[in-house]
Amino acid sequence: MTEKYLKLKDVLESGKFAITAEIPAPVSASSNEMEEKIKILKGSVHAINVTDNPGATAHMSSLAGSAIVRNQGIDPILQITCRDRNRLAIQSELMGASALGINNVLTLAGDPVKNGDQKDAKAVFDINSKTILTIMDAMNNDGKTMSGRELQTKSSFFPGGAAIVHEPEDNWDPKVLSEKASFGARFIQTQFCYDVELVKRYIERIVDTGLSERMYFIIGIGPLRSEKSAKWMKDKLFGTVMPDSIIKRMEGSNDQIQEGADICAELIESFREIEGVHGAHLMAPRNLSAIPETVKQSGITI
């Protein structure tokens, strides 16, 4: 593919507020479902994450999904977990991604196998997400695999990691984030956080440590569908920060889908004003069609 398109790396390095979104890879042997979802988001986001067997259930591979995203003219973010592959498979997948022009890679542990629908599957965890970052760093800078074998062509990965927004204690040292930066992470995407004041306190500490100069921080949110889904996220979804005030606001609305979009747009506007926040990551697997209007309402232009 020769079509030029905005790259997440360039957007972030230019100082523009980035909008990324997530598409769950479909349970399908066809590209049609993926292409339809991409069409919904095109023109409304800078990059699209493609999940890697979310919920520990079998889906189209993230690599294939990312290739489809790229073919549709949007910068993909390949998600790669430690759960399903050993170090050989991970290095092979990374080389394949680079060959396909897929440079954004988000490293994750992966959901526990016990949460999935194939309980007898074996979790691999040969290496952890930090090691994947070091692999990409070596492929980028040294042009070598873990064994020291030279690549014929170096990679140009833009590596990322994940984080959970939390209340920073007085003596909080973001050691894990610092390690990710040292291992080569260039951006961080967080789990859902609908609490602006908490984001301010969390990011203020990040800025104080200088980490916001080493990595770009993209805060996870999404347009809610209902107060029921907001309650479920608060109680069941790992890493989610959902204030009661958001749930009450959803409960009091006669049009909860619109209210959810309004809340998300307002959060984007608020995040733009926080020093050290470089973007918003929109996750709405069952409400994907609400993302374009939400982004438009926030005043962000792609």
What residue ranges belong to the model's regions?
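Active-site-adjacent beta->alpha loops and helix N-cap segments on the catalytic face
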Residues: T2, L6-K9, S30-N32, A56-I68, ...
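Active-site mouth loops of central-metabolism enzymes
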Residues: A18-N32, P76-L88, F157-W172, M250-D262
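Hydrophobic faces of well-ordered beta-strands that scaffold small-molecule active sites
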Residues: I19-I23, H46-V50, P76-I80, V105-T107, ...
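Active-site beta-loop-alpha junctions enriched in small/polar residues
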Residues: I23-P26, T51-G55, T81-R83, G110-D111, ...
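Short, acidic/polar
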Residues: S28-L41, S61-S62, L88-L94, E169-E179, ...
